[in-house]
Amino acid sequence: MRYLALCTDYDGTLATDGRVLPETESALERLLASGRRLVLVTGRELDDLQKVCPRLDLFEYVVAENGALLYQPSTDEETPLAPPPPEAFVTLLRQRGVGPISVGRVIVATWEPHESTVLATIRDLGLELQVIFNKGAVMILPAGVNKATGLASALEKMELSPHNAVGIGDAENDHALLALCECSAAVANALPTLKGAADLVTAGDHGAGVVELIEELLRDDLASLEPRLERHNVLLGTDDQGNEIHIRPHGETLLVVGADGAGKSELATGLMEKLAAASYSFCVIDVEGDYGTVAKAVSLGSPSRPPTANEILKLLRGAGQSAVVNLSGLPASDRRPFLMDLTPKLAELRARSGRPHWVVVDETHDLLPANEASGELLPLGDGESVLHITERPNLVTREVLRATSLFIALGASAQTLLDEFCQVSGLERPVTRFAPPKKGEALAWRPASPNARPVRLNIAAPQHGRAAAGAASGVGKTGIERPARARTGPLH
C-alpha cells in the first residue's frame, strides 16, 4: 500500500456549511478500516472546531490554526508549533477598529477588508508575521508557519513520510498542504488556482469530493493516477537527442549490470543522491562495504562489526532517514541468512510506514543467485521500488529478471549483456543502433514497454564518488523537489 494517510482540509472540503455529512463520515470510517490513517488540517481554532465537528476521534492528529497547533484527539494533547501572538499586536488591531477578531493559541484571525490595517500594524510594530488569506478570512501567523509545516510535524509523529500521504483541499491556504503530499486533490468547488496545481480534481464538491477520493484509494490505491504524477519522477540522465530519462519513485525495479569498473556504483550513488534530495528514503544492502559515504545516509556495520536488524529498523523509522547496511563484517555464508531475517522485517516496516521507499541490493548475484529459489528473499512488496546491481544477468535469480522494469547495462560489453538478459528472460532482443557506451554512458531499455528501443543514457555525475569502506555520512532532510520538466525521452 503506497498511500497510508489522507490529509484533508475541513471547511469547503470535508465539511459543507461547517458540518460533515453522514455519508462523508461513513467514508472516513471505511478508509480507517482499510488500515489507512487520517489527519485533519484546518485554519480553524481548536475550540471552534470541537464545537462543529464531534467526530475528531476519527483523526489521529488535527493540525489546527493553519499549521500552528497540533492536537491529538486520542490523548487530548495540544502542542503549539509556534509562539503566541504579541499582546501589543492584538491590542493595537482592536484600537484601530479591526473586528471581528479572534485569537487562538498562535493564530490571530479577522476578515476582509481589514487586511490593509493588519499589514500596516505589522509594519508599525516591526513584527515578523505573515498574512494568509482563505476565502475572505485574514489569518495572521508567525513567518514560515502554514499547513505544510504543521502537517509535516504530525506525519513525523506518526512515523510517516509525506511521500505516502494524499492531501485534499479547496482554498488559498491549501496550496502548501497539497504541495507537501505525494498526491494532491482539489474538490470541484476549489479555487481555479488550486485545481490547476492539483494532481486530481474530483467531480464532486465538498464532502462528496472527499468520498470520491476515498473510493479511489480503496479501489486501487490511486494506481490509475500514477501517469499524472510526473512531478515526482527522478532524473537519470539524457539520451543522445537531449531528452531527459526518468524513473518513477514508486513501483520500479531496476537491474544495473556491468563488469567491475564499468561504473555501476557511480550510477547507483547518483540515483541515491537524487532520491535523498527529494526526501525519499532508501536501504542499501551493501555486501562489500562500498557505499558508506552516500550522501544523507547512515552506514551501519563495518568490516569488524556486522549490523543488527534492530538498529537498521530503528534508523529507518525516523523521518528522512536512509541506511547503508554494511555486510562486509559477515562471513559470506551468513549473508543470505541475515537477509532472510531482515527482509520480512523491512516488508513489515514498509507496510506500516511506507519506508524505506527504495531497497538497493549490491552484488545481487551473491544474495539472490540464479541457481537457488529466492522468492522469500526478494525485498519486494506490492509495487515497491528496488535497485539490483550485479555483473551479469545470468548470475541472478529469474524472479529479479521477471520483475525488471528498467534494464541498464554499462561498459563495452553492454550489448552482449542485453542479449544475455533477453535470452535468460525469454524476451525478443530489441534492435540497437549505436556504438557500445563509453564511460559515463549506459545502455537503457524498458522491456515491458511496447515498441521501446534501447537508448544510450548519458549519466549525470554524482556529487560523491565511490565510497570508502566503513565511513558514515551526515543525515539531513530537504524539501520535495518539483523541478520544471524538460523534454521526456522514450524511457520515461
Role assignments for model-derived ranges:
Residues 31, 62, 184-186, 201, ...:
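Short, well-ordered beta-strand core segments
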